[in-house]
């Protein structure tokens, strides 16, 4: 032992033991796992005092990342082989660690994740094997916990209480002390706070902080999903009061310096159940045959100022969440459904995008203004469609009688839509045919019936107008070099493209464009296969080859829509990026472009970090770095909203299908992997797995390149029609399992 190590030991402990360097050299020489007793024997430490000092030293070395403790004992860590990343845990127990934008995620087996929760920041040791053919990944430690609360069902076994997590990604045994039950009854859903995280020496310890209800309670599915992801559907009383201070009508002072568009017959066209109206449209044709389109969007930015309390909360939420039985709004209802909603026959503040569109459907000029509008009518999609497509129908006549003045303007909108539709086709926007289902709930918030959503020209008309405004917005942001958020959609990744081309080759088909196909190439193939019996299969795989759209501070274009630049402008009531865009436009209009720091707001995104006063309406307080942080946050929140919505729909569907266990259904194969194939029932759209081991016959195998599951006699492909029997419903996992009853093969 060297003198430095000896001196360190003497200073640290009353009972000197070998220093860290000596212990590290011991591991280097033995090159294996050692438990504490083996280390003590190797160092000739025999007294209880020496062994206690060794225990402390080993724990300190573990804490400082020099040693790792596993069930086999301690092991030496090579710092150069350590990486840190976020763990994503699969419901089956294994997980993947994302640690690099360029490197593949690291696989960790189930037996290493007994003390880890989904989303934890972990440290992993990458160790090549003796043959250096592949690396083994060993979890070293959890650096930062992501989970602080767990939702589950309170259970009892003998005299002990425990929590059965609602999230199947949580596999740990979770103990609940009898003194920490918070009046919860066995069988009830609860939210529990983690008081002690698991390790090799103890299980997870929690205390119940809220009783959510019984499994039979109306709306329990939404309540569980929101709590599972830490989302509050409630509003702070102070924020509600702040939102209500703006009143219910636009103040006269706020109308000053606005462009007055109230005489123009703007109209809102939305779904029958819509409660917030954030867009209104008007168009007219010029004598030259061109068009003038005005898209007016609710001016949320006038009422929600950068860095004020409402803004901080809206920023946290980043989006409204739409569930089958409720909406979790980004803004308080006094704003979202009240003062900011473009209700008919009421003065409303709006950001207006005015566009000139030529006879070819190209936007030749656009400008933005702070406007004052009044919607002249609130129409549903079906009402608007009846006016232009079926004016002599009962609905068409009823709309015409109730508001005859609006009819010619709606017909103008439809005429412009047809021009824009031709341009859309020429531009090459990808047209996938997708099936959307609407869940109608009863008073108990269970599914009463399921019906397909029927889109008509009115849906597509409003969509095209919003696209025009969003593109004009993106061009405005790019031209003026304003740090803001673009909505980007990259082309297909090479890995997905290679797999797609292999599949198409098996079908005797090719996708043009080489390594960088365009949306035109996708559309050409879709048209080519439209009359084939396997058209649905091919469309499904073309769709799955696409990347996911996201927010970015850099314009990268939108592949699917075939736009060079695209941003979100049209929904500031329900999307924070749109609110940010409105602030950018206002800042340019008012010539206040100086970037300011957001201080700790973006770092913490919590109300209790609010330390400074709200900024003026003129301010645009976002630097490039701020926008970078916001782009990631808004993308994550958008994906989270989709996840929560899917989970609630899956839970409701499982509950709806449970009484039909043992019955047969006609279905189509929607996807497949090595576990089996997924089916979607034709009548309800309910989805579930047919496991490969349950297929009638023997020796079935999955061919990833051909997207087939087959044996010598039978072959299953995506799009095939099969008759399936509902075998079981897993309410906790929100999954259904089927078996093949009668195959059409």
Locate each region found by the language model:
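Electropositive polyanion-binding surfaces
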Residues: 41, 181, 191, 197, ...
